[in-house]
């Protein structure tokens, strides 16, 4: 029997779905007006934070399309959405906070995003210890030390962001996917949905801390269609009744839509709480859904089946054998290898998108049609 909670949810989602089928009103384009960019998130925008922090590099199969060797620690075959956005505003790729050796400087910003991170605080079972709260704390430490160093030697402004760069910089966020996806392993659908407001309360606390540090320009990505990831389909889609007509797991996408609906509601309220601030909400869900549902129209052959995997169609994915790895599965030694042409695939390794898909998403973001801005700036 459908619960009252589910009934109310379906009504809310109807509004959310109708909202996400078309570009958002009040469009806003990212620009090079911002002197620096500070990014927070998970593997969608991790440019090497987790690998630097835990002391490892992804398999050589990663980053073969663009960065090649030595790999930077991105969980992709090439560039991420954030990389394309930095290119568009003529800024260098963001250097990870924990990266101790690099030819890059931090003058134009810093990346605190770490793969597998959540908005919620990490626990003993978490793969990444760098939850959103930790990332915010890292930023606060980073800013404090940078300004101390510049005060001692002004020449360091050639390599480090000044106070002006911090106060006028753009603060970007792409996080929450792992909170939702991870919850399904131990919780019912109703429990996952009930968790969303708690997750967003924690997110808002991070915004509050950053505002206290002088952040005023916020750029927030909502989460994508989680139910269309091959990993999710492989584990939660064995019962075909749980799949929609596109082969995606309905419950996961339903949770993603509710998360986005409530995140958008929070986005509307934040400028009222924080004077002289500007918040931009970017509808990643609509862009990625369009790509997956209409992949052939955009030159892709496969929307869910992964490029770097094993097992062949329909998913070419084995959760016991990650991209580039060799392992024994069902008594057989197998290797998950990259496909011949990654540009024909939306999904890279079952969890992450290919560079070609990331380029598609970034180009749609840059049109400004999928972003909405709410401001309390005294103009």
From Swiss-Prot:
Does this UniProt record's set of keywords contain Signal? yes
Q: Which GO terms describe its cellular component?
A: apoplast
Q: What is its main location?
A: secreted
Q: Which GO terms describe its molecular function?
A: hydrolase activity, acting on ester bonds
Annotated signal sequence is 1-27
The entry's localization annotation reads: Secreted
Q: Which Pfam families match?
A: Lipase_GDSL
Which keywords belong to this entry? Glycoprotein, Hydrolase, Lipid degradation, Lipid metabolism, Secreted, Signal
Residues bearing glycans: 294, 330
Task: Provide the E.C. number(s) assigned to this enzyme.
Answer: 3.1.1.-
Which ranges does the record mark as transmembrane? Answer: none
State the similarity comment: Belongs to the 'GDSL' lipolytic enzyme family.
User: Per its record, how is this protein called by name?
Assistant: GDSL esterase/lipase At3g05180
Q: Which organism is it from?
A: Arabidopsis thaliana
Classification lineage: Eukaryota, Viridiplantae, Streptophyta, Embryophyta, Tracheophyta
